[in-house]
C-alpha cells in the first residue's frame, strides 16, 4: 500500500514539474509574441511629397496637434496683418522658443510663424491650400521645408523638390505679389560621410536653386554658416545636429536680415 502511495506521489510531483516547465517554456514565447506585436505596430501611411496631404496617424485620421496648430494659423491669416510669414517645419517652429530675438528682428514686419514640428512638403502644401493664406497678403514668405522628407525613404529627391515647387505655386495662386525667400534646406548630421539625410538635402537644394528668378522667388543658401571648415556640424549650434539652439537662430537672423529687408520694402 505504502509502495503504491509513493508511486502516486512521485507521479503527481513529476506532473507538477512538467507543467511548471511547460509554463516557463511558454513565457519566452509569449514575450517574443509581445515584441513581435509591438514591432508590427501600424505606422502612418506613406504620402507622396508633391501632393497635398494633412499629417495623419496610423489610423489614417488627421493628427490632432497638427489640426489645432493649422486652425490657429488660419485665424492669424484672417487678420491680414502679417507682412512676413515664416513657413516650414520644427526648425521654423523653433523660433517660438526665441521670442525675444524674433520680436527684435521681425516685429517691424508683424511677422507670423507658421512652422509645425514634423511637417513635410505635402503637409505644408495642404496647409497653404486649406486656409493659411486666405485673407493674408504678406510681402515675403520665408520658406524652408524638406528635411523631414529626406529623413525617410518614402520620397525621392525629385519628388521633394516638386513638393517645394508646388508650395510656391500655391502661395502665388493666393497672393501673386508675395516674394518667396526660399532657404536651402539646412545641413544635418555630423558630417558628409555616411549621412544620407544630408546628401539628399544637398541634392534637393541643387534642384530648388533653379527656382530662383530674382523676382518672385529668391533662393538663399545659408547652410555653410552652420558648418565648421571641415564640413562638420557643431553641436554648439545644432545640439542634435538637426535643430538650431539660440546661437543657431542668431546665425540665421544675421544671415537673412539684409535680404529680408530688401524683399520686404
Task: Kindly give the residue locations of the regions a language model identified.
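Extracellular/periplasmic catalytic domains that process cell-envelope and extracellular macromolecules
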Residues: 77-81, 104-107, 134-137, 173-175, ...
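N-terminal secretory targeting modules
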Residues: 1-87, 91-104, 261-265
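Extracytoplasmic/secreted proteins, especially bacterial periplasmic and envelope-associated proteins
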Residues: 72, 82, 86, 119, ...
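Acidic/histidine-rich helix-loop elements
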Residues: 51-61, 113-123, 151, 241
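Second-shell loop/turn segments in exported
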Residues: 111-114, 150-157, 192-195, 238-243
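Oxyanion-hole/transition-state-stabilizing segment in secreted/luminal serine hydrolases
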Residues: 93-107, 121-165, 170, 181, ...
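Catalytic His-Asp segment of secreted/periplasmic serine-dependent ester chemistry enzymes
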Residues: 187-265
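Structural recognition of the beta-strand scaffold that forms the well-ordered cores
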Residues: 83-88, 110-115, 139-145, 179-184, ...
Amino acid at each position: 500500500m505504502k509502495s503504491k502511495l509513493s508511486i502516486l506521489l512521485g507521479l503527481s510531483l513529476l506532473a507538477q514539474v512538467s507543467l511548471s516547465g511547460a509554463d516557463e517554456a511558454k513565457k519566452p514565447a509569449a514575450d517574443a509574441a509581445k515584441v513581435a506585436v509591438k514591432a508590427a505596430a501600424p505606422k502612418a501611411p506613406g504620402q507622396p511629397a508633391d501632393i497635398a496631404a494633412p499629417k495623419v496617424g496610423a489610423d489614417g485620421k488627421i493628427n490632432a496637434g497638427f489640426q489645432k496648430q493649422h486652425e490657429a494659423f488660419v485665424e492669424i491669416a484672417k487678420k491680414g496683418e502679417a507682412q512676413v510669414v515664416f513657413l516650414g517645419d520644427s526648425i521654423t517652429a523653433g523660433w517660438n522658443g526665441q521670442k525675444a530675438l524674433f520680436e527684435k528682428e521681425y516685429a517691424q514686419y508683424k511677422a507670423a510663424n507658421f512652422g509645425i514640428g514634423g511637417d513635410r512638403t505635402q503637409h505644408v502644401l495642404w496647409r497653404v491650400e486649406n486656409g493659411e493664406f486666405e485673407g493674408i497678403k504678406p510681402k515675403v514668405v520665408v520658406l524652408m521645408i524638406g528635411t523631414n522628407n529626406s529623413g525617410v525613404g518614402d520620397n525621392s529627391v525629385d519628388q521633394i523638390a516638386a513638393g517645394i515647387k508646388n508650395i510656391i505655386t500655391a502661395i502665388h495662386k493666393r497672393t501673386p505679389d508675395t516674394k518667396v525667400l526660399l532657404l536651402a534646406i539646412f545641413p544635418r548630421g555630423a558630417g558628409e560621410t555616411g549621412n544620407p539625410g544630408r546628401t539628399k538635402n544637398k541634392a534637393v537644394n541643387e534642384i530648388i536653386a533653379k527656382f530662383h528668378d530674382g523676382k518672385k522667388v529668391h533662393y538663399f543658401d545659408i547652410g555653410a554658416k552652420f558648418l565648421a571648415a571641415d564640413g562638420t556640424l557643431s553641436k554648439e549650434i545644432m545640439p542634435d545636429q538637426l535643430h538650431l539652439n539660440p546661437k543657431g537662430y542668431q546665425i540665421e537672423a544675421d544671415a537673412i536680415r539684409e535680404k529680408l529687408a530688401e524683399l520686404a520694402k
